[in-house]
Amino acid sequence: MFNYPLYIYRQDVKSKLMVTNSDFNFTIKETVTLELPFSEHIEELKQRLFHTFWIILILTFISLCEVKLLVKILELPVNNVKFFQLSPGEYFVSTVKISFYTGFLFGSPFAIGQIILFLLPGLTKKETKIILPLLLSSLGLFGFGLVFSYYALIPAALNFFLNYSDEVIEPLWSFDQYFEFILVLFYSTGLAFQIPIIQILLGLLNIISAKQMLAAWRYIILVSTIIGAILTPSTDPLTQLLLSIAILMLYFSGVGILFLIKN
């Protein structure tokens, strides 16, 4: 009698079959390759980018239709100031920029969702438990940064400049420059609020531990002051102080969260 294995490889299912008769014993192994071709990954990525582009474009168009309401919202943090335009098309260009950034902002959750759906099939359960909460937390922290900037940093900076020039000159501000000022403060604060996410990533990759982060608190105070000065478009000390305090609170919150994750 002959008894020897015969191996056959296929790409549909994984199984192991035994075929037996009176004379021969055959061992048939079938393997599977479930990975999609690279071209299909690229095609899926193109579709998700295309959908994201159209969502942002639609939200931008809706924002442009309601741009007067958005302008009034942006003007709320400051009182007793008259805005003007330096050129005939300045206000129009400003409203287009406001509409685009608003559409991009409200389209960000959809974009994050598309990224998650694209990455999800290729992630392990362990990676999914780490990456998904970090992406959602990053989006939430960015939103908190915008809220903190709108209700705390922007009024503090604008009131400082108004009080400094009070009874000396009449405040007449270019709306385009005012919008650029707010935009820089918005996004710099939103980026500063990503500090805990960076800390958690560094800790999970074992690049630096939570104890080492905590031990460097003296240097962090200095660094937070420098970052606050760099990210703040104004030169007033109050705005820089508020942003520096926020950075410190975020840093120590990141250390605490990393301690909880590791332990």
From Swiss-Prot:
InterPro entries: Sec-indep_translocase_CS, TatC. The chain crosses the membrane at residues 53-73, 103-123, 130-150, 153-173, 181-201, 213-233, 241-261. GO terms for biological process: intracellular protein transmembrane transport; protein transport by the Tat complex. Keywords: Chloroplast, Membrane, Plastid, Transmembrane, Transmembrane helix. GO terms for molecular function: proton motive force dependent protein transmembrane transporter activity. One of its GO terms (cellular component) is TAT protein transport complex. It is a multi-pass membrane protein. It is found in: Plastid, Chloroplast membrane. Its main location: plastid. Belongs to the TatC family. This is Uncharacterized tatC-like protein ycf43.
